[in-house]
Amino acid sequence: MKKMKFLVSQLYMLALLVLPFISSSCSDDDDPKVEITLGIEDGATVNVGQIIQLEAQINNTNTQGEIEYNWEVNGESVSNESNYTFMANEKGTYTITLNIINNNDNFQKSISINAQMYPSSFYVVNEGKYGTPGSVNRYQKGEWNYKIISELGNTSTVGVVNGNYIYIVSKDSPFLVKAELSNYSIVDKIEDGLGDNGQGNNFCIINDQTGILTTTNGAFKVNLNPLTLGEKLNDMDNVKNDKEDIYKTENYLFIRSQETVKVYNINDLSFNKQIGTEIKTGFALTKDGMLWAANSNKLVKSNPNSLESEEIQLPNNLKIFIDTTYKPSGLCASITENALYFAHAPNFNGTDIYKFDITTQNVNKFFTAPTNYSGYGAGIQVNPQNGDVYLIYTENGWGAHYLNTYIYVVDGVTGTQKAIIDYTGEYWFPSTITFQ
């Protein structure tokens, strides 16, 4: 009997010694280390208006059952999904916190994101408000410098940078203004000579001495030094009420005139031929060396060497935006792919942006217009330095709606939104973006 009591006593003592280890082992299994990542590094820098996709990644296979999510931005709850799309509306530091509940356990992960203004540099040529002079604004290092050039004609259309100067075209006098980029002072201008009711359209530099000014009354030679209007190009004598785009290649000058294309030899600006295909906007030179224009639901491809052309019908009732009054063309070419960008115009305004793959001839939506907004001016420009696509959108409506204008910057390959640049607060009516 004593032996039995002794054995029970020993087993009891052994159980007391082993129990802490068993308890500790179970505790370790029930409370595993949970690692949470959000798909972006803590302290990352993004652009204002950049779309950031955050995804809850729980690096622990022991989490079972229902998982509840709660995303917070600067302490405010914003989503209960496993993924969250973040966009900074203004520059500053944002604290993003993800709270997770699983089997009554709570886990949390917080990171900081720094939002900056998009670090780009470009000029915007503004039409001006309701018959008032146009102007040029500059965006640089996240800051706007307004009306750096302002003594322009009414309804300015384009700005062409050449060396240390920028040439700005306006529909009304002065039709062409030459300004220094170093201090933005106007050094010369062309104020007359376009004929009855003549208006400026566009401008092209031919060489160090000569440019071409396209107008409603035909295309004129321009002497650059000093800035003076020369003679009208051949085969332009009877042109009236025209809308003229222009593009220079190595051997030829292409001018959209009277809804066709007139081709001039670049060496002496003599008339070469007319391409009879109907054209309503142009031009864009793609990576395969072809020159493109458009006519509503058709793209027109021209070989800039042989001058042969062909039409390509767009599918799915797509229509390229073409304004009834002259605006610079929004048909643009990618610098990284053999592709074109254009704004689809289901009604009267350009909205969503489409991308035409020249190799496959497939057309896909590239960027969806913001709700209740439409493109303005040329609407599309491609940054020649990095291939980003810049889109100008203005709120639909009249009057004060035009105060709400934004410039969207998207990746030229994927269409991913990289930034939104605020262009509100004034009746700018932006016509084009010009890169230096």
Regions found by a protein language model. Name each.
Residues 1-8, 14-51, 103-122:
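Bacterial Sec-dependent N-terminal signal peptides
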Residues 130-137, 174-178, 218-222, 260-263, ...:
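Structural motif
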Residues 62-70:
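Solvent-exposed loop segments of extracellular immunoglobulin-like
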Residues 142-152, 185-194, 228-237, 269-275, ...:
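A short beta-strand motif characteristic of beta-propeller blades
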Residues 49-60:
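A short beta-strand segment in extracellular, disulfide-stabilized domains
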Residues 69-87:
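Surface-exposed, flexible coil segments in extracellular/virion-facing regions
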Residues 153-163, 196-208, 238-250, 277-289, ...:
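Repeated scaffold domains used in trafficking and secretory/extracellular systems
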